[in-house]
Amino acid sequence: MGEVVRLTNSSTGGPVFVYVKDGKIIRMTPMDFDDAVDAPSWKIEARGKTFTPPRKTSIAPYTAGFKSMIYSDLRIPYPMKRKSFDPNGERNPQLRGAGLSKQDPWSDYERISWDEATDIVVAEINRIKHAYGPSAILSTPSSHHMWGNVGYRHSTYFRFMNMMGFTYADHNPDSWEGWHWGGMHMWGFSWRLGNPEQYDLLEDGLKHAEMIVFWSSDPETNSGIYAGFESNIRRQWLKDLGVDFVFIDPHMNHTARLVADKWFSPKIGTDHALSFAIAYTWLKEDSYDKEYVAANAHGFEEWADYVLGKTDGTPKTCEWAEEESGVPACEIRALARQWAKKNTYLAAGGLGGWGGACRASHGIEWARGMIALATMQGMGKPGSNMWSTTQGVPLDYEFYFPGYAEGGISGDCENSAAGFKFAWRMFDGKTTFPSPSNLNTSAGQHIPRLKIPECIMGGKFQWSGKGFAGGDISHQLHQYEYPAPGYSKIKMFWKYGGPHLGTMTATNRYAKMYTHDSLEFVVSQSIWFEGEVPFADIILPACTNFERWDISEFANCSGYIPDNYQLCNHRVISLQAKCIEPVGESMSDYEIYRLFAKKLNIEEMFSEGKDELAWCEQYFNATDMPKYMTWDEFFKKGYFVVPDNPNRKKTVALRWFAEGREKDTPDWGPRLNNQVCRKGLQTTTGKVEFIATSLKNFEEQGYIDEHRPSMHTYVPAWESQKHSPLAVKYPLGMLSPHPRFSMHTMGDGKNSYMNYIKDHRVEVDGYKYWIMRVNSIDAEARGIKNGDLIRAYNDRGSVILAAQVTECLQPGTVHSYESCAVYDPLGTAGKSADRGGCINILTPDRYISKYACGMANNTALVEIEKWDGDKYEIY
C-alpha cells in the first residue's frame, strides 16, 4: 500500500487539496493556509469592529462531490462509433438518438480505437472542407468548462479550431442579457457587458450600509460565480452590524431563507412594475437625490413625466404595481420610503449585475429599472451603490495573473481578451505564436448558439450582435445573416463539452436538429455520456482537469468580468496537478487535439513541441508570479496566496462619477475614445441615459423595437399571466433560475453524490427525478401532493418531475431549476415527454426582443398535472 500524497488543483467551485493514494483520488478538501509562509489576510476597520476572513478557501457543493463524477459509471471509457453510421455508406441521420427512445442509448454504439476514430473524423473534415469549405464545420463549447487556463475553451479549443477552420456558434450573453441589451445603453460598461464595477465596496458597505435590497439575487446559490461560499461571511458581518436585508424574488431563495428580514414575491415578469412604483413614490414624495440626478442623468424629466402618467395617462402608482405584480401596494410604498430614508445598497443580481430577472422578456427594462433606482439615490456616494456583497474585497488589483478569458495558449484577440495584455506577454512572435482566426470574425461566418437548430434545419437567418458584443455600446446593433455572403451552410457539427438540452431554450429543437438530413456528420467530445452525446456519429472521451496539468487562479475569469477574483477573500494561484491518469482511454482536450493536428499535418504549429505542463510553465512566466517565486518553487508548493499591496490606493466603485472626477478605479474600460476628457460614463452624454442616445439613433435609422424602446418604459412580458392569451391554457408562470447544488449541468446526473441531495433530485420507484416547486394552493387545486410525479407542459413539450409543495412561492408561480444534465425521453427524442428534468424544453426560443438576441428563459407559461404514465409523443 502506498502513501497518501497531497496535491493541488482547482475547479469552477474553488481550489482544493487533492489526496491521492495508489493512483486513486481518495478525497478533496478546501485549501487551508499555512500562517508561517502564506501571505496574511486583509483587515477592515468599520463601526468599531475589525473584520478579517478565515485562513482558508471555500468550495461549492459540486466541487466537494467531484470525486464521484471522476469515477462515475457514466464516464465515456473509450472512443465509440454509432452502429448505424457508415462513413462510406449509409449514414442514417434519422437514427441518431434512437437508443434514447429505448432507454438504452449505449446500445447504439460500438467501441473503436483512437486511431480509427481520428481517421474517420479527419477524413470527414477533409471531405467537407474540399466540398464546401471550412465554414461548413460548426463547433461550439459549453459555457463553463473544466477549470484551468491552458485547458479552458478560450485556450486549447480555440488554438486548435482556429487552425482547423470552422464556423463558431457564438454564445449569447446568458449571464448578462438584460444588462447587455438594455443596461449598456443606459450607463455604458460595455467592457463588462453592462454590469457595473465593484471595487472596494465591501469596506464601503461595512462602514455605511443600513439596508441592502437583494433583487433577483441569491449569492448563497450562485457564489457570485466560481467563488464557493467566500461571500457568506460578509453577509454574516453585515447582519451582525444590524443591516436590514430585503429580498425581491418570486421564490424565497436560499440566501433569503438564511438572512432575510423581508421577502417580496412578485409574479413572474413583473419586477419592473415594482421599480416603477418605487420611483413614482420617490417622485411624488420628493425623496430622491435631485442634485445628483440633475448633474448625472440625461432625459430624466421626460422619463419622470412618463412615470407620473403625464404622457401615457397611467401613473405608475403602488396600486398599479399591485395589480401587475401581486405585491401589496402598502408594502411597495413602505419599501420605497425605507429605501429613501436609509443608506441602501442595491444587490441587483448575484454579482452586482446578472440575476435571473435579466434572462426574461422584461429583463431589459428590469436592468434599466435597477440603474434608474440606483441613480435616483445617488449611486457612488458613501452608503449608496449597486453591490451584491459578492465582490469589492480589498485585494491587490495590480498583481497580474490573467483569467481564463484572456485566451491562454490561443492568443485569439478576436474571441478572447488576449489582446488587452496577455498575448503580448505570452507569445514573442519568434519562438512561440498565437492562433488567431480569419473565419470566426465579424467579417467571417458565425451563428448564434441559441439558433443552431434553425441554422441547420432552415434556410437564411438574421440577427443582431456577434455574441458577447462588448467592444462598444453600438456593436450589439450590428446586423448579421446566415449563411454569411460567400460562405457555406453547415454540414458537420463538432459538439464540445456539456449539454445544450438542459441549458438552451425550447430544447426539443436541438434533439430534432440532430436527425436532420442536412447534418452529414456529428462528433461529440465529452467526459460523460449525457445530454446530446447519444446523438453523435463518433464519440471522443475527454478527461477532467484532475487528470491533466493546468494552471489557474481562484474564480478569475477576466474578459467581460474583469478583476472578478475580488469575489474571493484571497487571491489564490494554483498549479493544477495531474492527480491521476485519465480514466479508461480518455484524454485531455489538448492531447485529443494534438492527435488530430498530427493527422491534419498541423501538429508542429499547434503544439510547438510542448505538452500541457510546458505550456503551464510558459504561462507562469508571462504573469507576475516570477516576481515572488521561481517555477520550480511554485511546482513544489502547488499554490500561492497573493500578498496585500500596502501602497494600493482605495478606489470605491463609481465614487469618481458621483464626485465628477476622472475615473480612478483599476477597471480596464472604457476606451479613451469613449469618454470626454476621461470623465463621465461611456454613454454619448457621459451620463446615465433614461432616454438612450444609442437606441434613439437606432430608431431614427428605422430599427423600431417595441420591447426595447429608447426610453426606459414599462413593457409587459410577452408571455405573462395578465397580458398573454396563453395564460388561459397555461396559467402558471415558471421560474427557472440557476441550480443550488450543481454548476449548471456540472454536478448533476452522472450518478454523482448530488443526486442524493433531496432538494436536488427525488427518488421515486428507483428513478431520481428533477424537482418542481409548487404553491400549496395550486397543488391542492390539481390534486397534487408532495412527492407526486407531475407533468409540466406547454406547446413546446412535456417534462416529468417530482412535486415539492411549498409556501415559498406565491400562487400562480412554479419553480424548477434550469441546467439538468440528464435527457431521458420516454418516446421519440424531441417529440415526447422527458423524465430527465430538462425544464428548458418548456422555455421560449423567442429572443428577448426583436433586435436584442438574448434568451428569455424566465418567461414561460406552463400547466401541471399528475402524471398518468403516458409518453406524450405529440410534439
Curated annotation (Swiss-Prot):
Binding site for Mo-bis(molybdopterin guanine dinucleotide): 175
Known cofactor(s): Mo-bis(molybdopterin guanine dinucleotide)
GO cellular component, one term: outer membrane-bounded periplasmic space
Reactions performed catalytically: 1,2,3,5-tetrahydroxybenzene + 1,2,3-trihydroxybenzene = 1,2,3,5-tetrahydroxybenzene + 1,3,5-trihydroxybenzene
Gene3D superfamilies (alphabetical): 2.20.25.340, 2.40.40.20, 3.40.50.740
Record protein name field: Pyrogallol hydroxytransferase large subunit
Lineage of producing organism: Bacteria, Pseudomonadati, Thermodesulfobacteriota, Desulfuromonadia, Desulfuromonadales
Gene: athL
Superkingdom of origin: Bacteria
Keywords from the UniProt entry: Metal-binding, Molybdenum, Oxidoreductase
A single BP term in Gene Ontology: anaerobic respiration
Annotated stretches, region: Disordered: 82-104
Enzyme Commission number(s): 1.97.1.2
Cofactor note: Binds 1 molybdenum-bis(molybdopterin guanine dinucleotide) (Mo-bis-MGD) cofactor per subunit.
SUBUNIT field: Heterodimer of a large and a small subunit.
GO molecular function: electron transfer activity; molybdenum ion binding; molybdopterin cofactor binding; pyrogallol hydroxytransferase activity
Keyword Oxidoreductase in annotation: yes
Entry similarity comment: Belongs to the prokaryotic molybdopterin-containing oxidoreductase family.
Function, as annotated: Isomerization of pyrogallol to phloroglucin.
